[in-house]
A protein has these predicted regions:
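N-terminal auxiliary segments of SAM/dcSAM-dependent transferases
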Residues: 1-44
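The AdoMet/dcAdoMet-binding core of the Class I SAM-like
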Residues: 2, 53-187, 194-205
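Short strand-turn-strand beta-turns centered on an Asx-Gly dipeptide
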Residues: 48-49
Length: 208
């Protein structure tokens, strides 16, 4: 019998990937975490039934969210990454020898644990000596920071569930305060391709 992972995009659109077998399924304090093996995309991670990344194409997202701000800023030394429990953003940041320190605030330690075990392609640099991992809410973490970072990358889930607090005026104000004068902030944002996603983006923007 065929085994497929399917994610509803809208009531009228469903995307499916054939699965060889399931590598992991568990539930943390915050969300359900699953890892699957597929013939077409390799291993892939889902949170609460939503696709987060696949081994085949994760580099596209992680390279773009990291290397564009690194190319723009004249000298990045200190970086804050919020979310990013899969380790892909950290992997890309550690390619830069000029970066002196990276703080990573990830709310769910089980995501990191699972990715270390099942997704070493993305989690391969989570032991870099320049990295400090804090298992706490990114909203709370950044609130106490001031003039600390040259770059903030928010690699979160979409504007619902554990990531909802990262799309508010308060959070963006805290990030502005945490950045140095020439600092840059980059935020993952859901694509407004479908009408329901566009409405969610508009609601998030109104809070900002």
């Amino acid at each position: 019998m065929d085994f497929w992972f399917s994610e509803m995009q809208t009531p009228n659109v469903k995307l499916s990937i054939r699965v060889d077998h399931q590598l992991y399924s568990g539930k943390s304090e915050f969300q359900r975490i699953d890892v699957f093996e597929s013939p077409e995309f390799g291993r892939f991670l889902t949170l609460d039934g939503y696709m987060m990344l696949t081994e085949k194409d994760e580099f596209i997202y992680h390279e773009m969210i990291t290397h564009v701000p690194m190319a723009v800023h004249p000298k990045v030394r200190d970086v804050l990454v919020i979310g990013a429990g899969d380790g892909g953003v950290i992997r890309e940041l550690t390619r830069y020898p000029e970066i002196e320190h990276i703080d990573m605030a990830e709310i769910d330690p089980l995501v990191v644990e699972v990715c270390r075990k099942y997704l070493p392609q993305t989690a391969c640099r989570l032991d870099d000596p320049r990295l400090s991992i804090y298992y706490e809410d990114g909203v709370r973490f950044v609130r106490s920071k001031e003039n600390c970072y040259d770059l903030i990358i928010v690699d979160s889930t979409d504007p619902f569930g554990p990531g909802e607090g990262l799309f508010t005026r308060e959070f963006y104000g805290s990030c502005f305060k945490a950045l140095r004068e020439d600092g840059i902030m980059v935020n993952q944002h859901e694509s407004p391709f479908y009408a329901a996603d566009a409405a969610a983006c508009q609601r998030a923007h109104k809070r900002i």
